[in-house]
Swiss-Prot record:
Residues 137-203, 287-308, 378-422 are annotated as: Disordered. The keyword Zinc applies. A zinc finger (C2H2-type) spans 307-331, 337-359, 365-387. The keyword Transcription applies. This is Early growth response protein 1. Pfam families: DUF3432, DUF3446, zf-C2H2. InterPro entries: EGR1_C (IPR021839), EGR_N (IPR021849), Znf_C2H2_sf (IPR036236), Znf_C2H2_type (IPR013087). It comes from Xenopus tropicalis.
Amino acid sequence: MAAAKTDMLVSPLQISDPFSSFPHSPTMDNYPKLEEMMLLNPGAPQFLGAAVPEGSGFNSPVEGSEQFDHLAADAFSDMSLSGEKAVIESSYANQSARLPSLTYTGRFSLEPAPNSSNTLWPEPLFSLVSGLVGMANASPSSAPSSSPSSSSSSSQSPPLSCSVQSNDSSPIYSAAPTFPNSSPELFPDQSPQPFQNASTASIPYPPPAYPVSKTTFQVPMIPDYLFPQQQGDVSLVSADQKPFQAMESRTQQPSLTPLSTIKAFATQTSQDLKTINSTYQSQIIKPSRMRKYPNRPSKTPPHERPYACPVESCDRRFSRSDELTRHIRIHTGQKPFQCRICMRNFSRSDHLTTHIRTHTGEKPFACDICGRKFARSDERKRHTKIHLRQKDKKADKATPVSVASPVSSYSPSASTSYPSPVPTSYSSPVSSAYPSPVHSSFPSPTTAVTYPSVTSTFQTHGITSFPSSIVTNSFSSPVSSALSDMSITYSPRTIEIC
């Protein structure tokens, strides 16, 4: 009686088909005992190593090899190939709606009879394999040995494989991969499938994601803005960079606005800012100008000054556009001209030019009177006015000195040319004049003499016995001639002499 050792990894689909073509079948008496022994033994993968002693027929390579010579190796290879083909076709046919495969692992011994022709042995074999289901699922480890044919067949269809090998120096059935070795190969078709879907989900994921982000581009666009390389970059962006792409899309929105819209918005914004700045600064600058020039006359009539200031509170008009531009800078506070030496800004270019002269020391404007040089023409003009005021003061001082000289010369002449035996008295100069009466025995003509208040007056007290004509002639002639010159310059005062 010969014995054979078998390791099998089969599915319910292979229970009836592969073993139905065997030429010989074992007897029915030994299967109940074998099944009972395998159920009672908790270590199913180590069943043969623990229960079968050494020296038995399981490990003897010589015994039993002659009895199985009639089993050709071609029959087993054909069975293996046909079984793999059926498994592949069934697995592809039921790939969409198949259940997880069940793996049955077991080792059993066969004692075939040479003259037996019973073909009903797969039925007790099915009961044997069904009894080993729990033991196969509970065993965490098994022998890792496998033949090249079993590894090649398991790589093609891992969950369903059955390989056999016939050799003179080895048992009929070779060890097949057990559950722990086949579990990494069984579940990659199931567990990596959702993982593969998750990893490959990046391919269909961007199409629903980027159209949502592209909805933000619903603004008026010019075809020149849409460059092909930008669209290609959007399609190549991965799902991890999607938030940054959304941020870039928001930042690119203003650049996709038409140029006409940008220009209109910029013009409107600049006008609004100009109005705000003008109204704000006009409250600061304009009142001072209005107080300084309340009714400022203009040499040019209004119809010849077409450029008016746009500020509401300013009524200035200009005949040239550049003058209006310089004036608007007063309201806006714009200072586009900058000194490169001290970095000071100016609103007018001529102010910058005169400012640079303070750094260079250039003074092109010289005074015509004293020769003093100035950097600005208005400074020279202001300096010239100083000279004019000084000249006027000198002229005012020179006029009273020239007038006082004839008065002083008149006083001694008047005193010497008036020989009066009557005692006379000279009073101090007074600002007022009054008449001095002269008493005579006959009426005498009245003589009017005009002279200023600065001159001295003569007062004569007494009665003369000589003719009054002498007094009149000697007194009136020099006085009238001398005082007539003084009446030209000063305001006259009238003295009546009787």
